[in-house]
Amino acid sequence: MKKSYLYLMACAMGAMSLTSCSEDSTPAGGGGDSTIEVTLAQVSKPKPNPWLAQEEYSITHFNSAQTDAFSYEVKDGTFNIDLSKCQMTWSGPVNLMTLASTSPKYMWGMSSDRVSYLDISDGKLERVAEAGLPGITMKTQEQLTNMTADYATYDELSKTITDILGPAPQMSMANGNYVLCDKDNYAYTNAGQVMVRYRLANPNNPKEGIVLDHQIRLTDFTFNSFTLVGATMTYDGHLVVAAQNGILVLNRALTTIEDSYALPSDQILTNSICIDENGGLYVASNSRTPGGKGLMQKLICKDGKFSTSPADGAWQAYYDGGPKAPCIKLGYGTGSTPTLMGFGQDEDKLVVITDGSKRMKLVAFWRDEIPSGAQQVAGYDKRIAGVHEVTCGLPASTEWIQSEQSVVVGGYDAFVVNNINVTDQEINDKIIGVIAIGPIVKGPQGTECVRWNTKENKWESKWARSDVSSVSMIPAVSTKSEMVFVCGWNDASGWEVTGLDWKSGATRHRTILGKSNRANGAYAIIQYLANGDLLFNSVAGPIRVKY
């Protein structure tokens, strides 16, 4: 999504807002297809990774396939929430995800300034232990409160944030950006180019604290990268770490770099990676030049070694890039972490991203052997199974429709959001920008759900909502409730988590959180707990919202 991390740090963050819709809002319908309709609870799921703590929530984007799908039920209805009555903890300014641990009673809170161990049993959300990241100063509750206070102007907000975080607040995003918890309850995160794993001092008594178990500085091994951008765990128990200019594989103990792979010199990586149960590692990099082609690759990672040989199943395929986009979109290629689609006995096995075009396209690649009967899409690599220009129901005159979010996948359906809006406000820092979105700076609108037609091997639009927008949080879908959730700003009522029906796009759920910026999700992912409570990973720390 970005040209380089230095460029990312210098570029502006775009503004977005959500105009929430009433429950009887009707989406624009798409064409039908011949794919058999089944409930999301019935569709094939990614194979559980035996090296992760749980099947769901133990890695960013919820599973190794990065589908952003969870199995818990969420209520229909409209809920007005008083945040002052909610249980919350303090950390930030980015709390990307709260990870499932090996115990259903506890979760790991993963932040840009610390790691926490949270007791979620019996309806609680209580921090029982915490530890700072190497070289990072933990923010105080007072500082985080000031960051989320009400401000009349962008300049006023900017001054406060820089006073707290320094002259380049978005540098904090280089920490804790992709995280996971393994089967032995080690939590992995990063502080810049240092990869770290944590454990409990006493697994039988979490209140005794968190120990930094091991760390490894990767600066000399990342091919001159500025920062790390992703991490995953292979199905045979090796840690794969993505940097801007290459990929590394390490042992879980973080004592050995087992292998490395350098990206082509014209490519840069700023999104994370996903992996399948057979060692297929999917990497979507971007061109370093405007309009240049991005590169989707499948590497093979087995026994701690990379292979780029087609004989082992590896492949490469170029996809469309684009010009420099307005903020929030940065760089010239995809803003998506690759997402797998099709599992088990499903007919088609795909990996999907959005491309870098001004009006983005949803691109599906055959991730294994290309079917013998597959027709090549005109003008594209034969590895590309299908291409769909996303409209989000917006007028044909809309210049930019682009996304910084991963594609949400359930069955053969894919959900995307538009993150681009041209604004007169100059925004030169992503953290300042994301805190300004909604309350101070107006943002874009538009979501769309698209289906892969397995009979005709093509994308078809199911529905679109031009009146709904996701601000910066990663959307997520409940397979049991068949709702996809976004978070955005409503000028009348403030921050809101909105649930849209997966089949029709109609609004079914509204959690109205109010106008306090404590309810700003700042790049985090939307999560729900087993009992249906919202686990809201806000800019100042996780909040448990009960219904």
What are the language-model segments listed below?
Residues 16-35:
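Bacterial Sec-dependent N-terminal signal peptides
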Residues 274-399:
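Long, internal scaffold/assembly segments composed of regular secondary structure
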Residues 39-118, 171-184:
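Beta-strand-rich domains and repeat architectures in extracellular enzymes and scaffolds
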Residues 520-547:
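Blade-level signature of beta-propeller repeat domains, shared across WD40, Kelch, NHL, RCC1
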Residues 348-353, 402-516:
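Loop/turn-rich, solvent-exposed surfaces of beta-rich toroidal or solenoidal domains
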